[in-house]
Curated annotation (Swiss-Prot):
Protein name per Swiss-Prot or TrEMBL: Protein cornichon homolog 4
TM stretches of this protein: 5-25, 57-77, 118-138
Any one Gene Ontology cellular component term annotated for this protein: membrane
Function: Involved in G protein-coupled receptors (GPCRs) trafficking from the endoplasmic reticulum to the cell surface; it promotes the exit of GPCRs from the early secretory pathway, likely through interaction with the COPII machinery.
One GO molecular-function entry: CCR5 chemokine receptor binding
Alphabetical list of PANTHER family matching this protein: CORNICHON-RELATED
Sequence similarity: Belongs to the cornichon family.
Subunit structure and binding partners: Interacts with Sec23/24 complex components SEC24B and SEC24D. Interacts with CCR5. Interacts with ADRB2 in the early secretory pathway.
Length: 139
């Protein structure tokens, strides 16, 4: 059963890694003016909720399966994703708003956040892979 938990977490983490790379590529395209702000933000806002749900499911799964260290490692990122989604101002299009993305260095902060998440998801990927192999060996 433990191997199945880590296999699901590993697959979910792969999806989150690809999503983070997509965020970085799209934001860098906006930074270089290859796409306009409206199309960039609509592309990225489409994937905010799947990222939130995917990471929250893994966090809850680690809580339910009593893997406390991994749960506590995932909790801050899941909390940040939920906070960022809840705190979107009412007039904005979403987390990524085309009218505000060039203001106050938001583009740089979104890019930095995507890079940090990519590093975190890569760390989690190898941690889940190691844990899955360990669970398969112990069974």
């Amino acid at each position: 059963m433990e191997a199945v938990v880590f296999l699901f977490s590993l697959l979910d983490c792969c999806a989150l890694i690809f999503l983070s790379v997509y965020f970085i590529i799209t934001l860098s395209d906006l930074e270089c003016d290859y796409i306009n702000a409206r199309s960039c933000c609509s592309k990225l806002n489409k994937w905010v909720i799947p990222e939130l749900v995917g990471h929250t499911i893994v966090t809850v799964l680690m809580l339910v399966s009593l893997h406390w260290f991994i749960f506590l490692l995932n909790l801050p990122v899941a909390t940040w994703n939920i906070y960022r989604f809840i705190m979107v101002p009412s007039g904005n299009m979403g987390v990524f708003d085309p009218t505000e993305i060039h203001n106050r260095g938001q583009l740089k902060s979104h890019m930095k956040e995507a890079m940090i998440k990519l590093g975190f998801y890569l760390l989690c990927f190898f941690m889940y892979l190691y844990s899955m192999i360990l669970a398969l060996i112990n069974d």
